[in-house]
Amino acid sequence: MNLTHINEEGRARMVDVSDKDETKREAVAIGSIYMKSETLRRIHEGTIKKGDVLAVAQVAGIMAAKNTSHMIPMCHPIMITGCDISFSLDFENSKIDIKAVVKTVGQTGVEMEALTAVTVAALTIYDMCKAIDRDMVISEIMLVKKSGGKSGLYEREV
């Protein structure tokens, strides 16, 4: 198997994408944060002391997508053309499902940006609620779709 992020000396390198065609690309990632039912209720009611948890988490997720290349060493800086973060409150399972959709037109995909957006949104929820619930669990973060580029469409069965 040819490792694309390793040079001839066996050292890390950023892949050269300059010869790749620019294409419209999209990535969708999801994840969940489980919490006590009381915590979920308070988020829903807007009574968390630190403020509007989902509004802050949404902005944090978007900012994270835009700054992925600053956190993940081999990620290329990408001009993101769109980023949307959505939340679904699941009272039956006492969790919040998070979804990030990231778009660009470029030479490399935005999978890492979508995954980073979901992760940071979940971490932000944790941060804003940890005073009342330290048992929260962030899990099930995964890429569910990517399109564009040479490899085309990928969709995970969920």
Swiss-Prot record:
The keyword Lyase is assigned to this record: yes
Catalysed reactions, as listed in the record: (8S)-3',8-cyclo-7,8-dihydroguanosine 5'-triphosphate = cyclic pyranopterin phosphate + diphosphate
Lyase keyword on record: yes
GO terms, molecular function: cyclic pyranopterin monophosphate synthase activity
InterPro entries reported for this sequence: MoaC, MoaC_bact/euk, MoaC_sf, MoCo_biosynth_MoaA/MoaC, Mopterin_CF_biosynth-C_dom
Keywords of this entry: Lyase, Molybdenum cofactor biosynthesis
Binding residues for substrate: M74, C75, H76, M112, E113
EC number: 4.6.1.17
SUPFAM superfamilies: Molybdenum cofactor biosynthesis protein C, MoaC
Residues of the active site: D127
Disulfide bond sites: none
Pfam families hit by this protein: MoaC
Family of this protein: Belongs to the MoaC family.
Its job: Catalyzes the conversion of (8S)-3',8-cyclo-7,8-dihydroguanosine 5'-triphosphate to cyclic pyranopterin monophosphate (cPMP).
Protein name (Swiss-Prot/TrEMBL): Cyclic pyranopterin monophosphate synthase
Species the sequence originates in: Thermoanaerobacter sp. (strain X514)
